[in-house]
């Protein structure tokens, strides 16, 4: 059996249908699609969800609260911290199973532990000279397809990732004509990847997901939580993460004091809600159309809030286990933490550390 995990970054479940996304729709109808999609971790951002796809571990164990991680009492970028747990790639290596990773965001290789794969692209986590890049400097879908076509896919586990949907939504907004055109293009790119799997389709389980969706961030002014906290002298550290923010209390702050700060955060104009995610971690999110930051927003679309937790979740393929997993996601909504245990079970690997 070969297991393929394909991620379309930020791709909205809501647009999957026969007209706009015929290739995704073919897999959804020949296999199974969760009626309400999957559900991301909070915050609804890229790197923490991708790391958890491969570890199956929650943020309370990894410190991956978003694109920022809280590890050893300091913030670090999640792609710099690495997965902070044993991954499917680690398990494949121990079990002498072969693995491949071909991704459209080169930072994901370190984030997901995919540099441990037998074959990974971009090589050593950096796009080779001459690679077609999108406006944010990530490999375009066409580069991913070419790399996949030049890779031996007769292997046990494959990770594919397409990044252009996320970039287009950030630049133009998720409801824009440019984003809709990108949905169609990336569906075609996805179809090209599926075609590469056809020779071994009878023995393949294909899991297709997105990590989150996006929302418009067209309000002319960001919510400046960090500067407010500094001016108020709050004993916290804060990192903005699109329409979400991570607030970590200093060690000396009591639970009672931190609870008072939660209330003050929720009274700030532009903040819609928040949740205590760990004793020292509060996750906040903006009102619709707003994002955290300073001055004018840098994007027309973003993510981070609970409004962006919906994921694509489709299981297909010619192997009989595809039907079993498909029935499971039809009966119970999957989430980010569902997939590592599922992949491990399919490949006969041990459970997560």
Regions found by a protein language model. Name each.
Residues 237-342:
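Active-site neighborhoods of enzymes that stabilize oxyanions during catalysis
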Residues 110-112, 166-171, 322:
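Short acidic/His/Gly/Ser-rich catalytic and metal-binding motifs that mark active-site loops
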Residues 11-12, 163, 212-214:
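Catalytic metal-binding/acid-base residues of hydrolase active sites
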Residues 1-3, 30-34, 95-100, 153-158, ...:
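Loop/turn elements at helix/coil->beta-strand transitions in domains of secreted/extracellular proteins
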Residues 138-153, 157-160, 165-206, 216, ...:
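A long, amphipathic alpha-helix that forms part
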Residues 118-149, 180-188, 226-241:
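Acidic, His- and aromatic-enriched active-site or binding-groove loops in soluble protein domains
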Residues 2, 12-96, 105-114:
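Active-site nucleophile/metal-coordination loop of metallo-enzymes that catalyze phosphate/sulfate
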Residues 4-7, 23, 185-225, 275, ...:
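Metal-dependent active-site segment of extracytoplasmic phospho-/sulfohydrolases and closely related
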